């Protein structure tokens, strides 16, 4: 996490994209969708499947798209801090 990030004020959603065996899936596109399924942001997962978004508290859907498959996960951060969630693709 960058030193300039104030975890007492920032809401960070972070995690990994994994396959059905729990192995990391690098290079997947990870989309952040709001509570009405509207596209908000997209990042490319690192070679180790890691991703990170800065978001507001609320309900979010993470959607991973890759050649190995697709998957969704829901996270509902209630406040500032790091909120971890893995997205499993099938």
What are these regions (language model features)?
Residues 28-32, 62:
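Hydrophobic beta-strand segments
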Residues 1-12, 21:
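Beta-strand-rich domain onsets/edges
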Residues 7, 47, 56-58, 79:
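Surface-exposed loops/turns
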Residues 49-53, 83-85:
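Short strand-edge motifs at loop-to-beta-strand transitions and within beta-strands
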Residues 14-26:
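Structural motif
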Residues 58-68:
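A short, solvent-exposed beta-strand micro-motif common in secreted/extracellular proteins
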Residues 67-90:
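Structured interaction patches on ligand/partner-binding surfaces of diverse proteins
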Residues 35-50:
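Short, acidic Ser/Thr/Gly-rich low-complexity loop/linker segments typical of extracellular
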């Amino acid at each position: 996490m960058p030193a300039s990030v104030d975890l007492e004020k920032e809401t960070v959603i972070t995690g990994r994209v994994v396959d059905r065996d729990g192995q990391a899936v690098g290079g997947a596109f990870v989309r952040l969708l709001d509570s009405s399924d509207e596209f908000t942001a997209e990042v490319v997962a690192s070679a180790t499947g890691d991703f990170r978004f800065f978001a507001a508290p609320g309900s979010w859907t993470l959607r991973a798209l890759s050649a190995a498959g697709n998957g969704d996960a829901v996270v509902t951060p209630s406040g500032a801090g790091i909120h971890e969630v893995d997205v499993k693709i099938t």
